[in-house]
Amino acid sequence: MNYITAAIAFFYLSKKILQPKTRVVHNLKKLFTAFGLALISWVCTLATVLIVAAFVSVIGRSLSWYTHFYVSVFLYGTAAAAKLILVHTLAKKLLYKNMNEQYPGDIFFDASLMIWTVALAVITHLGLCSAFICAFWVAFPLLTKLMIHKEFSQKGATMKFVMMYMLGMFVPYLYTMYLSWTVFEMFTPIMGRSGSEIPPDAVLAGLIVVTTIILSSYFINFIYLVKSTKTTLITLAAMFVVTLILVCSGIFFPYSSDEANPKPKRVFLQHVSRRFHDLDGNVVKSDSGIWINGFDYNGISHITPHVPEINDTIRTPCEEQAPFCGLPWILPVHFMFRKNWYLPAPEIVPRNPIHFKVLSKELTPRNSLRLSFEVSGPSHMSLYVRPHEGSALSTWSLGDGTPVASVGGDYFVFYSHGLQASPWHFWVELTAPEKHSHGVVSLAIAAHYFFGEDQKSPQLYALLERLPNWTFSSGWSCTYDLFVF
């Protein structure tokens, strides 16, 4: 059905281009000019809206729409619509000023139909089930065009033409708006925990631009049919400017503790004690503190007024020689959360400490070094492995035996067991150069105390109590030990 729909649309477009045969080249030129203008308008719109999103992010007003979604529509939606209309208004005045208004209106409809038909054919060929959405955007507009062609060619853009046109577009527009709303319902909460490196305003602005382009694809031709777009442009520009001023003023607070519609800021706090050992097993560095992850692009900027000691002066330094920056991650998402904070705190002494033992070091027939370990501790532990320069982790006793590196080249394993379990035994095998005076691998183990009497220290509990009610916090204690072999 998709191929049949695309074939009918291509037949319609071919017939339009070939009438009359003496103007085939001229008709093709006009069609591809309209196609090029559509692409230019999309690029200009995306660039403009992303610049606005970057500005909002730089001034520290990111996620202003997190609780008030309508803000994103008035900020980015109006900017996108205004830019699209402006580009085509300029094209109308510069390229089509001496033409009958019906001609550019007709040619831009055909350009939109061609874009959707090509998309339908390509997506169907790729075997993607979502091709039926493109089929909607080909079949319904084409049927509508055929039904109102006589009315349009004889009388122009009458009220009857507009009403029939809108009615014909009702099904694809309604379904696309439903899908768009579903996408925004999914992505808006995700932006609240997308990390410190991805500007959420840029992501949402991009989604709004794509939605605007799709929904306006068959209405661009109306810009060439109406006498003036001045009133529309002024209205959209005024709405955008007012919204931008309000966003810059900080009137739209990102988070909410409303029980009916909660939009909390997620915060993870881990009271951690760290010990770094050298090649001889001696502790060369140790510290203790509460490690804080803000989870979104705003970091801790909104928390600082409530808890002044949590500020940018305590940004966590990265331990370059340690895997995952020497921090007890529970998931390998360090590349998404490069900005985190480390508040000095007393050392924790768990009642059920971790025990890490080297069982053996042996050379294999393949000239590899195999290290065997025994670990006992709480029910949840993380293992971090970083081969040194010149070394490589070839195999291990975990999973299917094939190590898979995380982003950055380090290896991560999350291990958990029941309340009563025997010690965890595993081995790693590394290929290494003959001379390795500084060791061949750095291996770290973290113990996470998610429950029980070791879960929260008094300092951690006190800090959690001071967080504002619009935060959703998770806190636990953990230890981190780094070894070099």
Language-model segment annotations:
Residues 272-485:
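Extracytosolic and intramembrane catalytic regions of membrane-associated proteins
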Residues 2-332:
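Alpha-helical transmembrane segments of integral membrane proteins
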